[in-house]
Amino acid sequence: MGEKQDPDKAYGKPAKYDPSFRGPIRNRSCTDIICCVLFFVFILGYIAVGLVAWVYGDPQQVLYPRNSSGAYCGIGENKDKPYLLYFNIFSCVLTTNIIAVAQNGLDCPTPQVCVSSCPAVSWTVATNQLSQTVGQVFYAANRSFCLPGVPGDMPVHQSLSQELCPSFLLPSSPALGRCFPWPNSTVPEVPEISNTSISQGISGLLDSLNARDISVKIFEDFAQSWYWILAALGVALVLSLLFVLLLRLVAGPLVFVLIIGVLGVLAYGIYHCWNEYRLLRDKGASISQLGFTTNLSAYSSVQETWLAALILLAVLEGILLLMLIFLRQRIRIAIALLEEASRAVGQMMSTLFYPLVTFVLLLVCIAYWAMTALYLATSGQPQYVLWAPNVSLAGCEKVMMNTSCDPMNQPVNSTCPGLMCVFQGYLSTGLVQRSLFNLQIYGVLGLFWTINWVLALGQCVLAGAFASFYWAFHKPRDIPTFPLSSAFIRTLRYHTGSLAFGALILTLVQIARAILEYIDHKLRGAQNPVARCIMCCFKCCLWCLEKFIKFLNRNAYIMIAIYGKNFCVSAKNAFMLLMRNIVRVVVLDKVTDLLLFFGKLLVVGGVGVLSFFFFTGRIQGLGKDFESPQLNYYWLPIMTSIMGAYVIASGFFSVFGMCVDTLFLCFLEDLERNDGSLDRPYYMSKALLKILGKKNEVPSGDKKRKK
């Protein structure tokens, strides 16, 4: 019969002693060159896509509304006229969706003109004004709402018949750069227009967006409270820094307090479930009486629900107690590594601020993609066509509508009333426009790949810095002078390709998840339960795969930073090393997660509570210089402070988490490479040596001196 395979051999042989190894390898060569070349070629293509988008794109159509002639409001010749006025906005309301009108103004079959301000009062052309001139009725009364170029001596009735001037005005507010009537405004006597039309067509838009009022109030609140928000973020920064640095003193007691707290919460849950189960059992409330129902809250009134919860919590409590009893040695090792990580961060304080570099690089990646996508979406040559408000009028039958025209040469003295050369849209017949979808896909792939590469760069750089701390035998004397900058230069010089390789693998999985989410969203209403179940299984599998790849990449980058091998070899060595110490991996991972979760909760919760009491004016007696500002939305600076505190805490604790993972891999390598002899001394701290019951041999001369 075959021999039983040794579990250690199944996951590779332990690392061998190397007398020349003294931490991160200095003499290394470039790794994954093919992937490096591919990444640089892709980046060059990404830059080319951006240049093409910049040449052909026109994002002004998104930022500024257009009038009937295609000219932008708010820039150029209309610089002092930032708002768009519809002569009869209710033709838009009655023919199309108001949101579509807000996005594509010329979908409305009515003339549109740029104005310096929206009308403030209701007005309509009186019967006795029809015989007067445009100059008398409009220009003299400061109603500059006619189309450009309308002469002042033109009769009003002619300007109205040709739709060169509006027949009525309503008090309006600017929203999305366009003048929208107030929902409760008084409507003049115009056919097919009533208060109901306004309420149905305008109220929804203004109530949901209320763009101008809300944006102004938000701006005012930020102007009043920005320095207090910065103060709150400063508090978050100090709390995060103190928490990381004090872990060397309180990591052990804090971890045990947290573990006891979790056990206590589970114990209370068991007690509560038992009380509920006993009461319902005495009442005879059983699931057999309830039967099957889709009302999930009804199941809380039957004894079986509480019995199942009781059993589940009891099992979890038992598992945690057994782990605490039998894995206490490994928990002590995890705590010692956390304390060592705190010392490492204290020795290299610059690592705490490296997330700022990552943040700036991520901001560049996202901003470049957003601008490229915007320019691509607005690429194409503008197209102008002939248009008239009423093609059934006499004289319009001879005009070929929707034919191309020049907006700089508007039709003059045409037999067709209101004939204009208007902007219709952008041509989609060019090479760029035909390839628009493919270019956008290229941009999305570039976004994912560059973001994952930037994150990988940060992990590898931090791993190189912290590895140099662990493998310094005499700390801090043997630590390099600039460990972070040295690791940064070393990573960029030799391992750009390896980082790109790992980032590409993760990107492909994330793209697959995004496609699956898109398909699920599109087919959600038409799927049967079986298809929904299959889709859910696929999504779950891809989610698990993404988590595993992130975990594997993270440890592969640590091995790359230390040994300078390519991505595949580093990933294999890291995986084998972790599998040979799987129990220690699980314990350290969970203890670290628990500690960092508590740290984030402490920082974010503390800043949130402090901000709430300050901005709601509940902290009294601090003097005039510390009075809370008067705000429209007091929750706005509170939420901003909380989100900022979370970002700051995540940045600090991501560095700490990377430090723990790096020191852990170095610790495992140290155990396999060395034995504590004079030739092969351990590099780990004295606390870890004491926990493991190991020690380094001391030269005979040092022993005599100690005596």
Swiss-Prot record:
This is Choline transporter-like protein 4. It catalyses: choline(out) + n H(+)(in) = choline(in) + n H(+)(out); thiamine diphosphate(out) = thiamine diphosphate(in). Choline transporter that plays a role in the choline-acetylcholine system and is required to the efferent innervation of hair cells in the olivocochlear bundle for the maintenance of physiological function of outer hair cells and the protection of hair cells from acoustic injury. Also described as a thiamine pyrophosphate transporter in colon, may mediate the absorption of microbiota-generated thiamine pyrophosphate and contribute to host thiamine (vitamin B1) homeostasis. Belongs to the CTL (choline transporter-like) family. The keyword Lipid metabolism does not apply. Residues 54-226, 271-306, 377-452, 520-557, 616-635 are extracellular. InterPro entries: Choline_transptr-like. The gene is SLC44A4. It comes from Sus scrofa. Residues 1-32, 248-249, 328-355, 474-498, 579-594, 657-707 are cytoplasmic.
